[in-house]
Each structure stands twice: as C-alpha cells, then as structure tokens.
Amino acid sequence: MPAVVRGGPPKPRRPRAEAPASPSKGKPAPRKAQPAAKLHAARGVGLSPTVALSVAGAALGLGLVVMLATGHRAERLGASMVRGVDNTFASAGFRLKTVHIRGASATAQADILKASGLYLDQPTLGMDLADVRDRVQGVGWVKDAKVVRMLPDTVLIAVEERPALAVWQNHGRMKVIDSEGQVITEADPARFPQLPLVVGQGADQAAGLILPAVASRPRLRDRLEAMVRVDERRWDLRLKDGSLIQLPAIDEESALIQLDQLDQRQRILDMGFARIDLRDPEMVAVRPRDAVLPGQPAADGA
C-alpha cells in the first residue's frame, strides 16, 4: 500500500526572492533597441527608412549591372544609375540652394560663381567637387580654391584671391596684374584708376619688387604718373608734372634712399626738374626744364 505522509500532501515551494544586485557589482540592464525612425544626415536632415533602403538598393543594383556590362555600355548604364540615385536623394531635399564664397572681394564673387557652373536645385550629392574647383581656379582672381559640400543644400567655395597690384600697359593694351605679374583677365582696368601704371615689356614681372618701395614714400607716390620699364633692366619714374626720375638697374632701394635725402634737404621733388638721374651711385645729375623767354612760344615737348 502506498506510504502515508503525515500532514497531508506537500505544499508547492515558493521560489526564493532574489536579493537586489549591489550597485557596484551588478551589470547594467541592457538598453532597449531604439526604433529606426530616421537616418539623420548632416545638418539635421532625415531620411526615412524607405528612402534609405531604396538608395541602398539602387547602389547595389548599380554595382551588379556595371559588373555584368563592359565598355561604353557599362559607362552608359553606370551614368544612368547614378542619375537615378541623385534624383532619389534630390527628392529627399539634397538640392543646391545656397553657395557661400569666402575670401573673395565683391568684384570677384560674380566671376567665381559664374565659373563654378553651379545652379539652383542641382543635386548636391552627385556634383563633382574636383571639377568645380578646377573651374573656379581658372578665374584670374583666384590663386587657390577649396570646395566643400555642406549637406543637404549648400556649397562653400573658399578662395585665396590675387590682390590687384597695378595696371600694366604693353603694346597699347592695358591689363590688371597681381604682385607676381599674373594677369587678372576678368578685371577691367578702367575700374581701377587708383592702381599705379607700369609700362613696357617685363614691367609686369618686375612691378612686384619696386612698387612696395615706392608706396612707402608718400611724397613720391602721390606725384607718380607711371613707371616705365627700360630694356627690361631698370625703371624710369614719370611724375605728374612731367619730371623724369631715372633709377639704376641694380640696387634701386639705395637710389630711392638717396632721393629721400635730397627731398628732405632741398625739396627736390618740388623743384620741377626735367630729369633727375640716379643711375650713378656716386653722383646725382639733374637737368632743369628749358627756360622760355617772355613772349617766346614754347617748343614742342617743353
């Protein structure tokens, strides 16, 4: 017969309560997975999962199609697929709305924007930034350029501008140049009457060395009409009153210091000499203007 257990049938055992984990020893509870609501792009623009998966699928399809195709067919198919991806992103807000140009003067900005080839609502992800940079660097104002895409709708063009140094006249043609003698083709010389005028073959390359020295001498600078390059070796300075100052081919700075000293002592720039010859470091030669007697007509060129 079955054994009899006193006290009736056994009661089910209650599970022991687990002791609370110590803050210092327990493992942190795993975080709950966040719902994939949006995949955020730069500057706070979101892509829905549907759009993101569509783009990923298009990119994968592009790779497979191009792998199966060869030659011009692959190029055409690849370009078509890229346009499709661009259009997908563009529909999500990746279209060009703003172009920021930094480091350029107001005069140069219009030329830079035109050369860039950028246009409103252009797909921003598909644009070739290297190509944009090459076009911008083709502008005469631009010494160097950097192009940055700022998603979703902005492009930044940062440039190092060539500062206009002088107007160069050669063979009857006038051009604006920078300190390296580089012609700024987009600059209209008529819009820069404040720039000094340099004349002659080689004047464009040599102007960057002599003009700062002249600019640092206000009395000479304010009287200067033009600087003429002679035999691509030296300078003649033509003043507004018709005077001519001849500089040596070597050590122009010493000759200008000598002119400073004469002007401080004798105000030689106010004396109206026809010529001041500084080519000989040991001697300054001057030639007065031809005197005209009362009632006598002046000779041509006097």
From Swiss-Prot:
Residues annotated as domain POTRA: 94-162
Gene Ontology CC, one term: plasma membrane
Annotated HAMAP family: FtsQ_subfam (MF_00911)
Biased composition (Low complexity): 18-38
Gene Ontology biological-process annotations: cell septum assembly; FtsZ-dependent cytokinesis
Membrane-topology annotation of the record: Single-pass type II membrane protein
PANTHER family assigned: CELL DIVISION PROTEIN FTSQ
Role description: Essential cell division protein.
Compartment(s): Cell inner membrane
Periplasmic compartment residues: 72-302
Keyword terms of this UniProt record: Cell cycle, Cell division, Cell inner membrane, Cell membrane, Membrane, Transmembrane, Transmembrane helix
Protein name: Cell division protein FtsQ
The organism's place on the tree of life at top rank: Bacteria
Cytoplasmic side: 1-50
Pfam families noted in UniProt: FtsQ_DivIB_C (PF03799), POTRA_1 (PF08478)
Naturally occurring in which organism (per UniProt): Caulobacter vibrioides (strain NA1000 / CB15N)
Record keyword Cell cycle present: yes
